[in-house]
Regions:
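Flexible, glycine/charged-enriched surface loops at secondary-structure junctions
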Residues: 117-121, 251-256, 303, 335-342, ...
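Long, contiguous, secondary-structure-rich segments that constitute the structural scaffold
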Residues: 489-535, 540, 599, 620-635, ...
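Extended redox/cofactor-interaction regions of prokaryotic respiratory oxidoreductases
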Residues: 134-200, 205-211, 235-239, 328-448, ...
Length: 715
């Protein structure tokens, strides 16, 4: 502890230069992968950015995104002042206004709408970043609106949903102790440096590695076995592996017999998924399926590393991942050291080995006291199982229909309309609202359709609480004051709460006081955290035993791990809601729509990570753009390109029955023949507008971004 304190002093003077090193974290990526930063500050300006060597997650390293932090902070595109729209929506015509005028205008409008239409008519949306989400949800519920929505309507939570349907509580891979790791459609070398280092260390100590991924990646290059599954067929692959494990009696009979529900029906169902059938459905050779199943089932302990969203970005996504997670229970690798070990979340879904009052902070009003959430009737399992938020993918449908009640206003924090399928349709729907506010760091295309735009500051200009899985915690301090007239998201939420007249003590107390309230059960205070600006290990981490289910059972209706979901049994006969992890091909595929596939023979797979981008957050930065100079570009297998007469960087048209875009061709062996991969979010070539708005998984509401049908042709 003393060594960390010595290393992480808030202001370490660099002798003779006038430079002070101030500690922070990079918040460009997701909450569990935020690397430590050393910010070199001179005369109130950040002049250099380095990785913080004492940070236990990143240990001094930064990826290309974090290295470009200065360009992000000092971008010429930063919003400088609150703005009020003066021209038509989408015109980008605004005039500067004061903060008081902006906040008063919002509060008056929201309260008018609340009085006329009810609080549920106002929507509260969060994109990136995520640190303020508990505060925005508390604001929404204190206002009386159930309609707190986030970008998690397309990212990660459907994966958690599949785990909760199976076990009641997710278990993450114990990378330090596992002897066999099955990575399912994740590529941590592009997305999660800490996990990538753990894989390298595991390989050094002899850990076996199986990787399921349609693409060739740095992770697949390290694998003992690479299973190049056809996009959207993950469930069939998992069921075929289960077939081998059961047929060869490699499953854990004690766990299955004493701690599971529905195994007999599940076992009978997987009989149909022989390795040969698996090869037919997935394109993975039968012998590789058998080899992988034997390796995963026979080496103990073994763990599965899931991805945040690729497997659930299919119209059959949750059922696919249920089939994958069943392998954990089938082999008895749930909640054991070296397996998929259960560590409860401490803050923002991140396990921090401390107890907090986050749930009490965000759930201020019972759902029963509010109107049904957006999408509740259409996606009831999303509502029942996650019990967290509304399903944002239903937003445009309810705006247009006005059913079961009208939606009149929306405030977005970092909202990007291009995250929706049929993105143009979403923007057109938002423009039908009576009032739209967006808070952002930059003037985005979404902001151009807002009535009021508010400037947010970056993470290095404010404080933030962050927990890490290894029991590390940090409460950052501003390295520099907020630039221009920008403010923190939390400050904006507090100001709005006051002007809305909400009688909520914790929305009046101030950020640091609220963090103290949340952390109270841990015995850690903001004052203590400030002594360790680079972060600290929690002094009394929670001690977690293996197999906690032996005493507490499983948090499922049966109290057991469920091969056959009792939640889904309630929806018997509803397509896509089968209680067993039934495999069905994607809604648009050669199997489901053969006539459509004749005209649109390629699988369109979008959004898989590139190392220099995370969504669109670094598109405007010259350093990251220089690493992919030909973007927007579509990845095409060279064999397909040769057949179509397409050369590198030539213009190609990608079309679906919905729309078409023109991009450059990027020829690469990373993608399979018959598959086109396109990164998302480009204003000049928005691939998400090629998807129908209702191309969704019926269980989660997630879009099928990774397995639609398309045509590609040379322009």
């Amino acid at each position: 502890m003393k060594d960390v304190k010595k290393l992480s002093r808030e202001r370490m003077l660099v002798s003779g230069t006038g430079i002070e090193i101030r500690k922070s974290i990079c918040t460009i990526c997701d909450p569990q992968t935020q690397c430590g930063l050393d910010l070199h500050v001179k005369d109130g300006k950040i002049v250099k950015v380095e990785g913080s060597k004492e940070h236990p997650y990143s240990v001094g390293t930064l990826c290309s995104k974090g290295a470009a932090t200065r360009q992000y902070i000092y971008s010429e595109d930063r919003l400088k002042t609150p703005l009020k729209r003066t021209g038509p929506r989408g015109s980008g015509k605004f005039e500067p206004i004061s903060w008081d005028e902006a906040l008063d205008t919002i509060a008056v409008k929201f309260n008018e709408i609340k009085l006329q239409n009810g609080p549920e008519s106002v929507i509260f949306f969060s994109g990136y970043t995520k640190y303020f989400r508990p505060y925005l949800k508390r604001l929404a519920h204190s206002f009386g609106s159930p309609n707190y929505l986030t970008e998690s309507s397309t990212c990660h939570r459907a994966t958690a949903m599949a785990q909760k349907l199976t076990f009641g509580q997710p278990g993450g891979p114990d990378l330090k102790n596992t002897r066999c790791l099955l990575v399912w459609s994740a590529n941590p070398f592009y997305t999660n440096p800490g996990n990538a280092r753990a894989i390298l260390k595991g390989r050094e100590r002899g850990m076996k590695l199986i990787v399921v991924d349609p693409r060739e990646t740095p992770t697949t290059a390290l694998a003992d076995i690479h299973l190049p599954v056809r996009p959207g067929t993950d469930g069939a692959l998992a069921l075929s592996m289960a077939n081998v494990i059961i047929h060869e009696k490699l499953y854990d009979r004690d766990f299955v017999g004493n701690h599971s529900y529905g195994f007999e029906d599940y076992s009978e169902y997987v009989q149909h998924f022989t390795p040969e059938k698996g090869e037919e459905l997935t394109g993975v050779p039968a012998d590789k399926i058998t080899q992988a199943a034997r390796m995963y089932a026979s080496i103990k302990p073994a763990a599965i590393m899931p991805s945040a969203s690729p497997v659930v970005h299919h119209t059959n996504g949750v059922q696919n991942y249920r089939a994958v997670f069943d392998l954990i229970g089938l082999t008895g690798n749930y909640d054991i050291i070296g397996g998929n070990f259960v560590v409860p979340a401490s803050f923002l879904h991140a396990p921090g080995l401390i107890l907090t009052r986050e749930h009490e902070f965000i759930q201020t009003r019972p759902w029963s006291e509010m109107a049904p959430r957006v999408g509740a009737d259409r996606f009831p399992v999303w509502v029942d199982v996650l019990d967290e938020e509304a399903q944002a993918m239903h937003l445009p449908f309810q705006i247009r229909s006005g059913e079961p009640y009208p939606l009149k206003a929306l405030i977005g924090f970092g909202m990007n309309y291009r995250m929706w399928p049929d993105s143009k349709g979403l923007l057109e729907s938002v423009e039908k609202l009576d009032f739209f506010v967006n808070v952002d760091i930059f003037m985005t295309d979404t902001c151009k359709s807002a009535d009021i735009v508010l400037p947010a500051c970056t993470s290095v200009e404010r404080s933030e609480l962050r927990c890490y899985p290894m029991g590390y915690i940090i409460f950052t301090q501003p390295a520099i004051p907020p630039l221009y007239e920008s403010r923190s998201d939390v400050e904006i939420i507090y100001e709005l709460a006051g002007r809305l007249g909400l009688d909520d003590p914790l929305l009046k107390a101030g950020y640091e006081a609220s963090v103290d309230w949340i952390l109270a059960p841990s015995g850690i205070s903001v004052a203590e955290l400030k002594k360790y600006p680079g972060g600290m290990f929690v002094p009394n981490p929670i001690k977690l035993p293996e197999k906690k289910y032996l005493k507490a059972g499983f948090k499922t209706p049966s109290g057991r791990m469920e091969f056959k979901s009792k939640v889904l049994e309630r929806y018997a006969g509803r397509p896509g809601f089968e209680a067993l992890p039934v495999y069905t091909p994607p809604k648009h595929s050669k199997e489901s729509t053969p006539e459509l596939a004749q005209d649109y023979p390629f699988i369109l797979n979008t959004g898989s990570r590139l190392p220099m981008f995370v969504h669109t957050r670094t598109y405007r930065l010259s350093w990251t753009n220089s690493l992919r100079p030909n973007h927007p570009a579509a990845d095409i297998n060279p064999a397909d390109a040769a057949r179509l007469g397409i050369q590198q960087d030539e213009a190609v048209r990608i079309s679906t029955p919905k729309d078409a875009i023109v991009v450059k061709a990027n020829l690469t062996q990373m993608v399979q023949p018959g598959v086109v991969h396109m990164y998302h979010g480009h204003s000049e070539a928005d691939v998400n507008m090629l998807f129908e708005g209702d191309y969704l998984d019926p269980l989660s509401g997630y879009p099928g971004f990774k397995s639609a049908l398309c045509r590609i042709e040379k322009v």
